[in-house]
Amino acid sequence: MSTPSIPQFTSPFSPFSSGSHSTGMAPSQTVGLDTLAEGSQYVLEQLQLSRDAAGSGAGDGAPSTSLRNSMSHTKDQPPFDNEKNQSTGSGFRDALQRDPLVEARSAIRKTSSSAPVRRRISRACDQCNQLRTKCDGQHPCAHCIEFGLTCEYARERKKRGKASKKDLAAAAAAATQGSNGHSGQANASLMGERTSEDSRPGQDVNGTYDSAFESHHLSSQPSHMQHASTAGISGLHESQTAPSHSQPSLGTTIDAMHLNHFNTMNDSGRPAMSISDLRSLPPSVLPPQGLSSGYNASAFALVNPQEPGSPANQFRLGSSAENPTAPFLGLSPPGQSPGWLPLPSPSPANFPSFSLHPFSSTLRYPVLQPVLPHIASIIPQSLACDLLDVYFTSSSSSHLSPLSPYVVGYIFRKQSFLHPTKPRICSPGLLASMLWVAAQTSEAAFLTSPPSARGRVCQKLLELTIGLLRPLVHGPATGEASPNYAANMVINGVALGGFGVSMDQLGAQSSATGAVDDVATYVHLATVVSASEYKAASMRWWTAAWSLARELKLGRELPPNVSHARQDGERDGDGEADKRHPPTLITSLGHGSGSSGINVTEEEREERRRLWWLLYATDRHLALCYNRPLTLLDKECGGLLQPMNDDLWQVGDFAAAAYRQVGPPVECTGHSMYGYFLPLMTILGGIVDLHHAENHPRFGLAFRNSPEWERQVLDVTRQLDTYGRSLKEFEARYTSNLTLGATDNEPVVEGAHLDHTSPSGRSSSTVGSRVSESIVHTRMVVAYGTHIMHVLHILLAGKWDPVNLLEDHDLWISSESFVSAMSHAVGAAEAAAEILEYDPDLSFMPFFFGIYLLQGSFLLLLAADKLQGDASPSVVRACETIVRAHEACVVTLNTEYQRTFRKVMRSALAQVRGRIPEDFGEQQQRRREVLALYRWSGDGSGLAL
C-alpha cells in the first residue's frame, strides 16, 4: 500500500490546514485580521469574548455552556482518528460536526455592531517595505508616485518563524528515495502543499506559528509518520559521515527543487525556512553552485573548506566567522574592529539573516553581484547601480575630472566596472567602499527624502565596508593555506604581530584578500575621513594603505609575461578581452621564483601604477597638512613607469602610452591629478625633507649653515622652474593650437573616446562647445598649477608656522627671502582670482586645495597685521581674494580650519581698510590664540587637531 500523502493527516482543527478538506467543513468567509483567529493561541481569547457576548446578549449563558461542552467533547476526542482514516481514507471528521471556534466567532458576530471591519492590504510594494512606509497596495502606489520611485512587487512572499521539522524531514526523505524514482513525487507533494497554501488570502502577511500546537500536532501523528520523520532526520545526520561519492545526491536533489523556492517552502502555513537554517546542514547537502540560480557567477561559488574538491582563489561563503561574506548565510560578522580603530565595528544587527531571492536578471551592472547580498537591507539594487554611475561621473565632457570631491583620481577603468557581460572581478569590500563614497554626495531621492536618510545609509555602508575589509588581516583565506602553513603560523605570530600575513603573500603571490582591491578600499576610507573633522584618525587608514602597498611592492614594475611575449615585445591574445575581464583577482608581486609564470594583463599593471602614484602624492600632501615626515620614498619607485594619460586609460588605448618615463615626474603632462598635481607633489617631497632636516634637534643648525643646504634649495628651485615651463607649454598645446580637430602633436582624446566615459548631460554637445570647454578646462588646470607652484616657492623660502611668522623673533621679515616669498604670495593670490573665475565654487580639487590656499595666505595675514593701513593696494586685493576663496571652500568642502582662518582674515582685512576696533590688542591676541591651534613647528601636528 502506498504511503499516504502529508495533507491526508491535516486536522480541520489545525490553523495550517491546506484547504483541501472543503468537503468536510464549510470554508471560512473571513479575510484579513480574522484569519489570525484560526490560530490555536487565540482559543482562550475568543472563548472569553464569546462568553461576554453571550452574557450581554441572551443573559442565560446558553451559548457559553454549549461552547464549553463542545470544547470538552473535542478535548476528549483525539484530533486524528486512525480508525476513521483507515475506513474512509479521508482523514477528516464528520462534515456535520461544527468547529467550536466557528461557533465562538459566530456568537461574536451576532452580538457585535455592524461597523465595517478594517481591512489590511495583503502586501506592500518593495520600496515601501524597504523604507518601512505605509503603502496603499496599488501599482504604482501613492508613495512611489510622490517621490518618483520605481514601484515593484517583485520580492518573494515569506513566512515568519522557525523552519518546521517536517520540511527538513521531507527533503531528506526525497533525497534518499531519489534513486528509486520517488524523489519527483515527494517534491511534487511538497510544492503542491505550498501552492494550496499560497492560494489562501492573507496568510502570507498574517500567518502565525504556534510551537505548542506544533508539538501537539507531531505527537498526535500516526506511528508510521513518526517513523518516517525520524528516519528522515537521521538521514541528514548520517549524510555527514557518508562516503564522498554519495554526497552529491542530496545536493543535486535540492538543486532540482530550486532553492529559491526551497528557501521559502512551507507546509500548510508553517513559517518559511530562512537561509540561516541551512547552517545546520552538512557540507554535502548544499549544492555546489550556491543558494540561488540567479546568482550564477562561478567565481562566487559556495565553498566549504572541509570539502576536498573545493575550488581555490575564489570568494568564499564558508562557515568561518572571519569570512567577509558570512552575512550572506546569516552568519555573524567579526565581533569587533581592531583596538587601534576608533570607528564602530560592524554590529550583527546590521547584517540580518537574509532569505535569499534570485537577483534580477536585468541587473544593470553585474559587477555588483558580490556585494548585493550584503546591501540588500541597506539600499535598493537600482540605487546601487546609480551610485556606481556617480562614482565614475566626470564633471567635464572634454577631459576626465571626477565629480565627487572624494574621488581624487581614477584608479580603475569605468568600462571594466560597468561592462554588461564581462565586468572586472572585484572584492565586495571595494564595491561597498565605492558605494559609500558615492553616497556622500548623491542626490538620489532615497538618500534625501528624509533628511536623516543619507547619514543612516552612509553609516551602514561604512560598517559594511569595514566588516568586509577586516583591517590589518590579509592572510590566505580559509582552505588556501600553503603546505608549510604550520611553520608560517609561528613566524607570523612572532615577526608580523599576529596580523595573519602569510609568508607566501610576501613572496610571489598575494591572496585575494590582500590584493590591490584592499589598498583601494583603504584609500576610499582614508579620503573621506581626511575631508571630515577627524583628520587625525584618517592617518590610521592612510598608514594601513601605505603599508599594504609596500608589502605588495606596488612601486616596482612586474616582469613581462614571458609566455605571452613575442620578439617585438607585443602581447598575444585578445587585448580587449584582457582589458575587460582580467583572469584573476590576485596580482603578482613580481619577486620570487614563481613569478615568471604568472600572467598579468596590462590593465592590472596600470592599476598597480596608478594606485602607487596616488598614494605617493597623498603621502607628500599629508606630510604638509600634518607636519610629518615622508613615508614612501623616491627610491622605492625609481623604476616605476609614470601613469598614462587619463583619457587614454579610460578607453584602454595602452599602445598609445607605450613610451613613458620612469620615476617621479616633475613636469605637467595632463589634465588629471596624475598629470598636473603629481609633479608638484614630487617637488613638495624635497621641500618636506629640507624642512625636517632644518628643524632637526641635533643636526638642524649645522645643516642650515652649510653649503649643502644652499645646493639643495637651488635643486628644488630648478625643479619648480622646470614645472613652470612645462605648464606654459601645456597651456599653449591645449589652447593656442587647439582647433576643431585634434592636432598632430596632440593625443587623440576627443570625440568618441569620451562619449562613454562622461555620463554628463553635455556629452551630446557640439564639437565647437566641447573645444571651448576644453580650453576653459585647460586654463583652470594651469591656474591651479600656478597657485600651488607659488605656494611651494613660499614653503621653500619662508616659515610654515603662522605663530612664529607673526612673532618674527629672528627678524626674517627684513630679510631678502621674505621679499621673494611675498612676491610669490601676491602671485598665488592672483592665481586664486583666476581660479575663482573658471571654478567659482572651487570644486575641481577641493580635497587637495585647502592647505595650499591656507599656507599661501599666512604672509598676507602677516602683512595686514604689521602694516595695517599702510599696506599696498596689491596686498589689499590679495587679502580680499583669499577671503572669497575661503568662503567658497567652506561651501564646497566644509572644514573647521577654513572657517577659522576666514574669520581671522576678515578681521585683519577690516584693520587694513582702517576699521580699527577699540579692543585692538585683544583682537590681535585672539587671532594668535586661534592660529596656535595649527602649528608647524616642534611637535605641532598641522591641521590634525
Swiss-Prot record:
SMART domains referenced in this protein's UniProt entry, alphabetically: Fungal_trans, GAL4
Keyword Transcription in annotation: yes
Record-annotated DNA-binding residue ranges: 125-151
Keywords from the named record: Activator, DNA-binding, Metal-binding, Nucleus, Transcription, Transcription regulation, Zinc
Protein name, UniProt field: Xylanolytic transcriptional activator xlnR
Regions of compositional bias (Basic and acidic residues) in chain numbering: 73-84, 565-581
GO CC terms in record: nucleus
Compartments, as annotated in UniProt: Nucleus
